[in-house]
Design a protein with these regions (language model features):
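Residue-level recognition of tetratricopeptide repeat
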Residues: 36, 69, 103, 137-138, ...
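Canonical tetratricopeptide repeat
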Residues: 66-67, 100, 134-135, 169, ...
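TPR alpha-solenoid repeat register
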Residues: 63-64, 97, 131-132, 166, ...
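Structural marker of alpha-solenoid helical repeat scaffolds
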Residues: 23, 57, 90, 124-125, ...
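Register position in tetratricopeptide repeats
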Residues: 40, 73, 107, 141-142, ...
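N-terminal leader/linker segments that initiate helical-solenoid repeat arrays
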Residues: 15-69, 73-78, 82-85, 89-94, ...
Length: 591
């Protein structure tokens, strides 16, 4: 019955655009009722299409607002943009209509349009410019389009150059977009503003100072911010000051010092949960699974951060090849940012242990329960099929998902990757090229196409140019650093590739980057260093297929000798520029 209703609604949506021009349109209620039925039946595309049809010639502001909200909630920004355009036409003074138009434009990477709408919001909102910037800061912090958010913030600062609130937004956006040097400039400028809101708000001022210190560390200037934070602890030994110091040590990847400070902090009753959480995260990141288990078990006893504790204990059980225990632990993760990853990992366990129907049922439930993350969930489902060797099924899932969410960038990337897995390199490159046409200034799209060209030794000159543009926009992004190193390797510049790959690996020690760095070290004659990198990454990402294949391929070849006149091991410099990789761990709050 559900399938039949879905087909009927789909036919209604299709027919809405196929009527003869002389036919009377259905009443508005037809569209809104069928849209609400589609929502109840978890058919987001149909719901958004029906509401967009209802809004096309509508003057009822409440209906237009509902249509825009449904399109946005259903992850249909192209439809949301059309509805918002109609809404602003009907009510040109509506701040809400402008905001809806801005958010849709940002999702479509139409940055100039987004900036234009946001400028109208900021200038006309009855809440005031600073309040709107504060709301925008929160919105962008939860937006996955980090490069678009950064470019939007840059444009808004151009329009509001004397606004501390605008500079705050820019600082946080550039930091999330892996350009810490630019973030330093923004935070410094914000703090240099004449007496304003931050002077009357101690917590906001403290946050700006801490963010500036973190940005400086990530940009390669670690010593002074760390010394200042240490002095603050010595001068005023409060738990809050010590936590700030810990977070900066973590940003600088000085884990041993951070662990020492956290051991002190965990004896404070109020701060013990956050200290135990961070202790567990650091031990987990370092591969000390027994120590991490003890920390997270202690965290459970505090009855704080329970979802985090269960999630990481599940990952540890997973690493120990104890799937039944892992599944029980993942099932305890009830909410928060790790809830969906826990259940997705559970689907992988079920799929790989002969319970594919249960995995599919869990995926269906997840899509219904978390509609705002449906593309991510469906991509994970396809990945399970790739790992199981069922590429046709994976591609079918992704292509069907793309018809439901045609604006999803993540699905486009996943389709390109699946085509590549099938050996359809031309199809993969076409998909990425089309995406870049839609988002020509998106560093992620530039990097994806550039890397794929380089990985298959296609048009290396263009590959380098694309990656170079992405690198200029996000010089501390691990994926882009990896691509830069890999295209240099493909061009034969092996020694020049090493520092980029080292910087990438320092920021993200995943298997793919380890495979690339290890191969470069191997080709340079440093087989022992390559083996060390592979072993280190294998402990955390042992199922990585590229890592396994690279190790096997190179071990079957004769090891090259280290170049004459060079030291026994390569340079340990962490980056091609004097910058420290971004912080790997989240900065929690005390709860």
């Amino acid at each position: 019955a559900r399938v039949s209703m879905g087909l009927a609604l789909a036919a209604c949506a299709a027919c809405a655009g196929m009527r003869h021009k002389d036919e009377d349109p259905p009443p508005q209620a037809f569209y809104t009722v069928t849209a609400e039925i589609a929502l109840a039946r978890h058919q987001p595309r149909i719901a958004a299409l029906q509401y967009a049809a209802a809004a096309a010639n509508e003057t009822d502001v409440q209906l237009l607002q509902r249509a825009a909200q449904v399109a946005a909630d259903c992850l249909q920004p192209s439809l949301a943009a059309k509805v918002a355009a109609r809404w602003t036409e009907v009510d040109p003074q509506s701040v809400e209509a402008r905001r809806a138009a801005a958010q849709a434009a940002l999702a479509l990477y139409k940055i100039d349009q987004a900036a234009g709408h946001y400028m109208a919001v900021l200038r006309s909102s009855p809440k005031g410019t600073d309040a709107e910037f504060a709301a925008l800061e929160i919105y962008l912090d939860g937006n996955d389009n980090v490069f678009g958010a950064r470019q939007l913030a840059d444009r808004l600062v151009g329009a509001f150059p004397s606004s501390e609130a605008a500079l705050r937004v820019q600082g946080f956006a550039t930091l999330r977009a892996d350009d810490p040097a630019a973030a330093v400039r923004s935070f410094t400028a914000a703090l240099a503003m004449p007496a304003g809101e931050h002077d009357n708000n101690d917590s906001a001022h403290r946050e700006l100072l801490q963010s500036l210190a973190r940005a400086r560390i990530m940009a390669g200037d670690a010593e002074q911010p760390l010394a200042q934070a240490q002095n603050s602890v010595e001068r005023d030994n409060t738990p809050a000051n010590r936590l700030d110091y810990v977070l900066l040590l973590m940003a600088a990847q000085r884990d041993a010092a951070a662990l020492q400070q956290l051991e002190i902090l965990r004896h404070n009753t109020e701060y013990a949960p956050v200290a135990l959480r961070l202790l567990g995260l650091i031990e987990f990141q370092e591969g000390h699974l027994d120590a991490a288990t003890a920390r997270f078990a202690d965290l459970l006893r505090t009855e704080k951060y329970l979802d985090d504790a269960f999630y990481y204990l599940g990952l540890i059980a997973d690493r120990h090849n104890d799937p039944e225990h892992a599944l029980r632990l993942y099932a305890e993760v009830q909410s928060g940012e790790n809830a969906v990853p826990a259940l997705l990992r559970a689907t992988t366990i079920l799929q790989t242990h002969g319970a594919a129907p249960a995995a599919e049922e869990l995926i269906d439930r997840l899509v219904e329960d978390e509609p705002g993350r449906a593309p991510e969930i469906l991509t994970a489902s396809a990945r399970n099929h790739v790992e199981a060797g069922d590429l046709p099924r994976a591609v079918a899932i992704l292509e069907q998902a793309a018809t439901e969410y045609p604006d999803s960038v993540d699905l486009r990337y996943a389709i390109a990757s699946a085509y590549e897995e099938q050996g359809r390199i031309a199809g993969s490159l076409h998909e990425l090229s089309e995406l870049l046409k839609l988002r020509p200034e998106d560093p992620a799209a530039q990097n994806a196409l550039g890397y794929t060209l380089a990985d298959h030794s296609r048009d290396l000159k263009r590959a380098y140019q694309l990656i170079e543009r992405a690198y200029a926009a996000a010089p501390r992004n691990s994926a882009i650093l990896d691509s830069m190193g890999w295209v240099l390797f493909r061009q034969g510049h092996i020694a020049e590739a090493e520092p980029y790959l080292r910087a990438a690996y320092a920021g993200d020690g995943g298997g793919d980057i380890a495979a690339h760095l290890g191969e470069v070290l191997w080709r340079l004659g440093y087989a022992n260093d390559a083996e060390h990198i592979w072993a280190e990454a294998g402990a955390a990402d042992g199922d990585n297929r590229l890592l396994k294949a690279t190790r096997q391929r190179l071990r079957s070849t004769q090891q090259p000798s280290a170049p004459a006149g060079q030291p026994a091991s390569p340079s340990k410099s962490p980056a091609p520029s004097p910058a420290t990789p971004p912080m790997r761990l989240p900065a929690p709050t005390v709860n």
